[in-house]
Structure formats: structure tokens, C-alpha cells
Amino acid sequence: MMQKRGTWSTVIGLIVAALLLVPGLAPAADSGPYFGIGGTFAKQDFDTGDLDQALAGTGLSADFDDTWGLSVKAGYKFNRYIAAELALDYLPGFEWNVATSVGGTPLSGEATVDVTAWTLALKLTPFDLQKVKPYFVVGGGIMHASADATVSIPGASASSSDDETDICGKIGLGVDYFVTDKVAIGLEGAYWAGFNDLEEIRFYTVTAGVAYHF
């Protein structure tokens, strides 16, 4: 029996030693800068109460489509638990299209909202699991939203546009998986909210990306 235990201990020890020697399984650096890029799916949660009120009686509602976008970030890890992150998120093409008839007159319309956000966030990693690093993120910054709308009836059309810039906030959670000690793939979910002139702009995001840690 003692010999069996010794044999299993030797085998397990050899496996652990082999895993530690694989470069791709080396633990990530505890501190230093990193740069990442990813693709984002954004699900709108716009506050369309005023627009819905204007559409009252038409049987229509302002139901904007979701969209896809791009996220670019640069950060610095102070230690294995805390990092600061600057990010640029570009989410074009939240669209609303409608085709109906009002009083027997055909009417069509479309509206598009494009969102760009620059944020500074605190990234907290409560568990040090070497390759797998779950985290919480909370931050704020500046959001810019541009809206274009067009309404058409036979023989006539009208268009309008608007641009607003104001503060915003985000909160979320995610996980980074270190493929090597330098390269990580990540998945993050977050909720965003604009404030003041952009209080109607709210949405959820899911971002998948890759980052290089120097």
C-alpha cells in the first residue's frame, strides 16, 4: 500500500511539474501595462417615454434595434487585484424603422443613434487564480450621442439631427483567461447609463476581446 501511495505521489508530482514547465500555463505578471481590443454586442435600454408619448394614438412605439461595436482599452495593473483602465467604446447604429398608415396616408420613418464613450474605470480582481481572473469593473467618463431622424409621406419628407455630450457611468463584471503569460482573452458584461442631457441613453454590453500584457 505504501508503495502504491508513493507511486501515485510520484505521478502527480510529475504531472504538476510538467504543467508548470508549459510556457502557456505560466501565471500572469502581477503589475504592468496592457492593451486590448474587442468586439461588442449592445442591447439598448433607451428611455423612450417622451417619444412614445408623441406617438400615442398611432399604434407605434419607439423600439430601437440592438447593435454591434468596437472597444479599445489601455490599462495598468498596480498589483494582482487592482487595475485602472482607459477605454474607448464605439457603438454605431441603434436603429428604429417604421412603416405605417395614418389617416389613410402612408408614412415611413427611421432614426439612428450612434454612441461613443470614453471612460476611466477601476478593475477589481478579488480572486488570484493565475490563469483565470474574474473581475468587477466600475467607472465613468464622457459619452457622445448623435441622432438622425427622417419622416416621409408621399411627396414630402422631413429630417432632423441632434448631438449631445455629457457624463456617463458603467458597471459590470467579466473574466480574463491567460492563454500565455502575456496574452489574455476576455469576456465582459456591463450596464451603461448617460446622465443629464443623455439620461435617455442606456444600454447593456457584452464584449469579447484579446489583450496583451507587457
Features from the language model and the residues they span:
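Cleavable N-terminal export/targeting peptides
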Residues: 1-31
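Gram-negative (and chloroplast) outer-membrane scaffold detector with strong preference
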Residues: 29-32, 36-45, 68, 72-153, ...
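A short pocket-lining beta-strand/turn micro-motif at the edge of beta-sheets
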Residues: 31-33, 167-171, 181-185
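Long, hydrophobic/aromatic N-terminal blocks
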Residues: 40-69
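Short, conserved structural micro-motifs that define repeat-unit consensus positions
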Residues: 71-77, 172-174, 184-186
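Substrate-binding/catalytic groove segments of enzymes
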Residues: 133, 145-149, 179-186, 197
